[in-house]
């Protein structure tokens, strides 16, 4: 029998060999099937119509002949055989595609992938469109027009951010104005109120420049007619005596909720205390409040030690040393975080404050001493080069500054101790001068 004609039976086909042997042993009648004698079995005749049954019978008869020695057994050929494969089943594959309406919505499309046996890759895959990239601001980069709109909008947003970005100004640098309707000819324009021309400002339709000199002069005359002190500085200097010099606000502030501890309070920004001219509410920008808070924080105990440390540092400083320390109120920036309850103002002797002794005469005398040391260093004959003269001059000036500061601290401490020991019946009113 040709091995190439062997057909494997399906899973549902079966062949019961026990019935054949039982009939053969009992001497049942044989019938001729395809030129061969096989036991007669009605059940086997019903199975002959099924695919693969006749081949199975032929194979069984051949095995019987081999056992009886009628047919010689030959080696099995290892050539290929025909195999019945079950028909391919349709495979469903889910592909994700974004919805056309909203960028965040999604749809699922089911595609039947058939004809698996004919495709080399076993799958008839249709080209699926990739999800489109969703651009910011809801713009899709589908074509050139949308890309152009997106670029224009991005540039516009960048320009707005750059324009509204907070700028940092150097100390002493004037802030630009932002006038839009006053033409910078009103007193609420900082440039016009300070008697300066607008420069590098953000104002619109500006007339505060040399091109509109006639209109600017007319606006100045009108302002002076209404208020002769219109262009005077807001922070003025009043002299009540020979040594009583105070800096105060000309009109006073009108703060209500900040406690006069914010930079939009003109008194606080100018480093001057509020006075009776101010109409503020809940004011805490006073010397009494400053000293009370400083004592509660424990700074009054180490006040003298800190000043003496500054004196020693300035006396031993050299040009190679870094920038020296500056004595400041370490808790000055924490006023906003450590607000005390509002208390009635208590009158104190101004002679207890350190700024009381920093008069113009003391500053002038200390300056003259340092200038004399500088001249002496420049006229020093042993020093040959200019660099050595400058280095020596800096050393002598710093040493003289430390000596003057130490002398002022010593005298101030002695006078303060005398005030604590001696009772004072007449205490002058609180002074508003600062250093």
Swiss-Prot record:
GO cellular component, one term: DRM complex
UniProt record similarity statement: Belongs to the lin-54 family.
Binding partners and assembly: Component of the DRM complex, at least composed of lin-9, lin-35, lin-37, lin-52, lin-53, lin-54- dpl-1 and efl-1.
Binding site for Zn(2+) 2: 177, 191, 198, 201
Locations listed in the record: Nucleus; Chromosome
Disruption phenotype: Decreased protein levels of DRM complex components including lin-9 and lin-52. Double knockout with the programmed cell death regulator mcd-1 results in 100% lethality during the L1 stage of larval development. RNAi-mediated knockdown in a ced-1 mutant background results in reduced somatic cell apoptosis.
Chain residues that bind Zn(2+) 3: 184, 198, 203, 206
Domain commentary: The CRC domain mediates DNA-binding. It contains two CXC subdomains (joined by a flexible linker) which are both required for efficient association with target DNA. Each CXC subdomain coordinates three Zn(2+) ions.
Annotated site residue numbers, Interaction with DNA: 226
Keywords from the named record: Cell cycle, Chromosome, DNA-binding, Metal-binding, Nucleus, Repressor, Transcription, Transcription regulation, Zinc
UniProt-annotated binding residues for Zn(2+) 4: 253, 255, 260, 265
Predominant location category: nucleus
Positions bound to Zn(2+) 1: 177, 179, 184, 189
Protein name: Protein lin-54
Known function: Synthetic multivulva class B (synMuvB) protein. SynMuvB proteins are required to repress the induction of vulval development by Ras signaling and probably act by forming the multiprotein DRM complex that repress transcription.
Listed GO MF terms: metal ion binding; RNA polymerase II transcription regulatory region sequence-specific DNA binding
Binding positions for Zn(2+) 5 per the UniProt entry: 253, 267, 274, 278
Residue spans of biased composition, Polar residues class: 102-120
């Amino acid at each position: 029998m040709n091995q190439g004609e062997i057909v494997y039976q399906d899973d549902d086909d079966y062949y019961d060999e026990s019935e054949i042997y039982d009939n053969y042993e009992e001497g049942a009648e044989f019938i001729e099937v395809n030129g061969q004698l096989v036991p007669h079995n009605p059940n086997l005749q019903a199975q002959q119509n099924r695919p693969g049954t006749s081949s199975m019978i032929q194979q069984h008869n051949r095995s019987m002949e081999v056992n009886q020695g009628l047919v010689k057994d030959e080696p099995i050929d290892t050539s290929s055989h025909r195999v019945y494969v079950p028909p391919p089943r349709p495979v469903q594959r889910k592909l994700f595609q974004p919805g056309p309406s909203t960028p965040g919505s999604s749809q699922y499309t089911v595609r039947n992938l058939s004809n698996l046996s004919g495709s080399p890759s076993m799958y008839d895959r249709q080209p699926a469109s990739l999800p489109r990239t969703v651009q910011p601001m809801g713009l899709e980069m589908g074509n050139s027009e949308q890309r152009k709109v997106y670029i224009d909008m991005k540039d516009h947003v960048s320009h707005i951010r750059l324009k509204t970005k907070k700028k940092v100004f150097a100390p002493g640098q004037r802030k630009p104005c932002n006038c839009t309707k006053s033409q910078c000819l009103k007193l609420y324009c900082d440039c016009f109120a300070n008697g300066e021309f607008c420069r590098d400002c953000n104002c619109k339709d500006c007339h505060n420049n040399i091109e509109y000199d006639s209109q600017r002069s007319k606006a100045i005359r009108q302002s002076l007619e209404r208020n002769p002190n219109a262009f005077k500085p807001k922070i003025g200097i009043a002299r009540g005596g020979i040594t009583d010099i105070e800096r105060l606000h000309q009109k006073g502030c009108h703060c209500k909720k900040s406690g006069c501890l914010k930079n939009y309070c003109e008194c606080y920004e100018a480093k001057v205390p509020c006075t009776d001219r101010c109409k503020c509410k809940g004011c805490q920008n006073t010397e009494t409040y400053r000293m009370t808070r400083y004592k509660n924080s424990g700074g009054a105990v180490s006040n003298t030690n800190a000043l003496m440390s500054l004196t020693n540092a300035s006396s031993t400083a050299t040009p190679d040393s870094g920038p020296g320390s500056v004595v400041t109120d370490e808790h000055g920036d924490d006023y906003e975080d450590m607000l005390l309850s509002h208390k009635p103002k208590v009158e104190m002797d101004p002679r207890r404050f350190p700024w009381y002794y920093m008069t113009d005469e003391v500053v002038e005398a200390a300056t003259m001493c340092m200038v004399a040391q500088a001249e002496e260093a420049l006229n020093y004959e042993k020093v040959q080069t200019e660099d050595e003269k400058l280095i020596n001059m800096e050393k002598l000036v710093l040493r003289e500054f430390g000596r003057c500061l130490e002398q002022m601290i010593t005298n101030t401490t002695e006078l303060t101790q005398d005030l604590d020991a001696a009772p004072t019946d007449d205490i002058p009113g609180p002074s508003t001068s600062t250093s």
